[in-house]
């Protein structure tokens, strides 16, 4: 992908506006997870090191535009950045008509979603952001799939628009996995429903050699192959779709599964009741009417791990079982360790996937972990991300 990169620009004495994703959880004024802030720090530090006057902007939560509330303020983030950077980071609330700032200084602009027109990508608002700077740096991959005034709009109107290091790294990794993948490529797509991952499955079926499915998605594929799935989550109206995907790409199906008796499961306390349920390994042809499939079986996990061993590119989106409960997590554990041991390039994304990576402590063995959420999925689906498209356009 061809786009301007912040790291290639001379930022000395330039006014630089960096759009980061600093949307962190805040409880009683305290930041409860600083992962996104830690990820953004190197970009800010790199701009300061070049002698730029740095303005940072972000959204936080989902405020009503034009109605700022203290609990949705970026004040705790400004305090965090001051400590982390070792210099004062002022929070500016009134900045749209101009910001007084000197090279080597950094300020944080208050929650962009307090501004009327932010989410609708209002052109006048976007032009005001653009007028603040000599260089606009888009570094928030997690919001790149939304055309908003502080993302797509500011990039469109700024004198110079570039991708920050975080965004550039993400796009390079996604390009490597999806646009120029080294073959053989294997994708793991798991989740409760085929319907929510249909575009992902369809897109990946065009580029990968094997498509491993898990969770409720696998149940629909098992049903399409004529197996009884008992009381398992399954979308019968998408059986023909599953058949069409399986006709296009190799979809290795589970040969054994881990089930529980559905009559023992309290759906109001799903995970709690699963912790007490008996986990039984069964061949797929032996699934009974009351069985609920909650993981792939040991033989299947071993077979899938063998497939992953020979892959040169692996894309992982979704755990293959209810890994939050240990007796239904062995399949996900086996696959996560196989991905970690693979010599191929691996990329993983999606909230549940990140939780599994944390649980099985394989983060440092995955080639690239995307924090993009919805943006990651839309990129995998082959959709155009507005804030990326404008950077390509302006390159």
UniProtKB/Swiss-Prot annotation:
Q: What species was this sequence derived from?
A: Acinetobacter baylyi (strain ATCC 33305 / BD413 / ADP1)
Task: Describe the protein's quaternary organization and the partners it interacts with.
Answer: Monomer.
Task: Give the record's family classification.
Answer: Belongs to the phosphoglycerate kinase family.
InterPro entries in alphabetical order = Phosphoglycerate_kinase, Phosphoglycerate_kinase_CS, Phosphoglycerate_kinase_N, Phosphoglycerate_kinase_sf
Which positions bind ATP?
197, 324, 350-353
EC number(s): the record gives 2.7.2.3
Recorded metabolic or biological pathway in which this protein acts: Carbohydrate degradation; glycolysis; pyruvate from D-glyceraldehyde 3-phosphate: step 2/5
Keywords from the UniProt entry: ATP-binding, Cytoplasm, Glycolysis, Kinase, Nucleotide-binding, Transferase
**Location relative to the cell:** Cytoplasm
For whether the record's keyword set contains Kinase, the answer is: yes
Q: Pfam family example for this protein?
A: PGK
Gene Ontology BP term (one): glycolytic process
Residues holding substrate: 21-23, 36, 59-62, 113, 146
Catalytic reactions of this protein: (2R)-3-phosphoglycerate + ATP = (2R)-3-phospho-glyceroyl phosphate + ADP
Single annotated GO MF? phosphoglycerate kinase activity
Q: Please verify whether the record's keywords include Iron-sulfur.
A: no
| Protein name in UniProt | Phosphoglycerate kinase
Q: What class of enzyme is it?
A: transferase
């Amino acid at each position: 992908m061809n786009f301007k990169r912040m790291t290639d620009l001379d930022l000395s004495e330039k006014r630089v506006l960096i759009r980061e994703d600093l949307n962190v959880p805040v409880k009683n004024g305290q930041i409860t997870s600083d992962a996104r802030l830690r990820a953004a720090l190197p970009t800010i530090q790199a701009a300061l090191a070049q002698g730029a006057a740095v303005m940072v902007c972000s959204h936080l939560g989902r405020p009503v535009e034009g109605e700022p509330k203290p609990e949705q303020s970026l004040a705790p983030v400004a305090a965090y950045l001051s400590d982390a950077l070792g210099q004062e980071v002022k929070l500016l609330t009134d900045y749209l008509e101009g910001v007084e700032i000197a090279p080597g200084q950094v300020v944080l602009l208050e929650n962009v979603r307090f501004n009327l027109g932010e989410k609708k990508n209002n052109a006048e608002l976007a032009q005001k952001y653009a007028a603040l700077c000599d260089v606009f740096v888009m570094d928030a991959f997690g919001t790149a799939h939304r055309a908003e005034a502080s993302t797509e709009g500011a990039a469109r109107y700024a004198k110079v628009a570039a991708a920050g290091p975080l965004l550039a790294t993400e796009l390079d990794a996604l390009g490597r996995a999806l646009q120029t993948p080294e073959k053989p490529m294997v994708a793991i797509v798991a989740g409760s429903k085929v319907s929510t991952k249909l575009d992902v499955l369809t897109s990946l079926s065009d580029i990968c050699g094997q498509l491993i499915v898990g969770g409720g998605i696998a149940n629909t594929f098992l049903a399409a192959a004529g197996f009884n799935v008992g009381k398992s989550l399954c979308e019968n109206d998408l059986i023909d779709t599953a058949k069409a995907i399986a006709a296009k790409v190799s979809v290795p199906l589970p040969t054994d599964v881990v089930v529980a008796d559905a009559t023992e499961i309290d759906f109001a306390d799903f995970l709690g009741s699963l912790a007490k349920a008996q986990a039984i390994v069964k061949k797929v042809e032996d699934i009974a009417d009351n069985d609920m499939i909650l993981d792939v079986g040991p033989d299947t996990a071993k077979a899938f791990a063998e497939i992953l061993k020979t892959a040169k590119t692996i894309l992982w989106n979704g755990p293959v079982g209810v890994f939050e409960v240990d007796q239904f997590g062995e399949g996900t554990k086996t696959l996560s360790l196989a991905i970690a041991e693979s010599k191929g390039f691996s990329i993983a994304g999606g909230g549940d996937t990140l939780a599994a990576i944390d649980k099985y402590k394989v983060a440092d063995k995955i080639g690239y972990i995307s924090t993009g959420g919805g943006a990651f999925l839309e990129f995998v689906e082959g959709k155009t991300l507005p804030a990326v498209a404008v950077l390509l356009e302006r390159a």
